Amino acid sequence: MNTPDQSQLGRVSGYADQYDASLLFPLPRQPKRHEIGVTGTPPFFGADLWTAFELSWLNLRGKPQVALAHITVPCETPNIIESKSFKLYLNSFNNTRFADAAQVQTRIRTDISEAAWRGSDRQATVGVKLVLPEMFDREPVQELDGLLLDRLDVECTHYTPAPELLHANHGEAPVTETLTSHLLKSNCLVTGQPDWGSVRIEYSGAQIDQSGLLRYLVSFRNHNEFHEQCVERIFMDLWTRCRPIKLSVYARYTRRGGLDINPLRTSHPQALPANVRTARQ
């Protein structure tokens, strides 16, 4: 089983420019899920939506080609893909010749699927969509919808996760709300480098105290964990402490190394959102 300290994070790495799928470094989801009380089938659905902004290869005549890539990794895969290894893997396409973009897309889908499902009896594919330059002007920028929590003038004193700040009013009629914040910040599990994100929380049930929720989100500020793990922690803290009927937690993190990761976790199956970047991305 791979562990984060075995990855290339925080190390000086050489950059292969010839295709090499072995650069991908999957990490099991379960150890971090165990920390938040998820020991069997997770009580959530969803996916990790990746955007790759630095993808290039050569055509059969040696001419460079470029594209964006949208990659969708279901959260039921046993592994996440460590992001630096993903970057190194994509860089290995740089001087490799492919017949066309479809061949590149198929290659990425095959490799990411194998890494994400490695070690599992179940095998499935991840979603991969390439956006070619003639379609770049159709890539929108859109902010997360919902009532902005950041408008609240709260005093913040907790900078490591403090789920005790979460409260819901179970004595009143249930509500349906969508709340957002741009103040989510955590740190890379291995390097401690800052990760900046915006988060959207949609729920139905007892009304969640908004001031406490904002202070709780701020409490991730000095916490070291990968993006996917932070979102699952937020989901589980809200699910167990506020006991909503329905819950969705969706975060969009700023890019690093030409990649952004945008995890979604929901209590009920639902269609995935379009992978649309925000202004900060």
Curated annotation (Swiss-Prot):
NADPH binds at S83, K84, R256, G257. It catalyses: 7-aminomethyl-7-carbaguanine + 2 NADP(+) = 7-cyano-7-deazaguanine + 2 NADPH + 3 H(+). Substrate binds at I81, E82, S83, H227, E228. GO terms for biological process: queuosine biosynthetic process; tRNA modification. GO terms for molecular function: preQ1 synthase activity. Keywords: Cytoplasm, NADP, Oxidoreductase, Queuosine biosynthesis. Pathway: tRNA modification; tRNA-queuosine biosynthesis. SUPFAM superfamilies: Tetrahydrobiopterin biosynthesis enzymes-like. The keyword Oxidoreductase applies. Disulfide bonds: none annotated. Its main location: cytoplasm. One of its GO terms (cellular component) is cytoplasm. It is an enzyme of class 1 (oxidoreductase). Homodimer. Belongs to the GTP cyclohydrolase I family. QueF type 2 subfamily. This is NADPH-dependent 7-cyano-7-deazaguanine reductase. It comes from Paracidovorax citrulli (strain AAC00-1) (Acidovorax citrulli). The gene is queF.
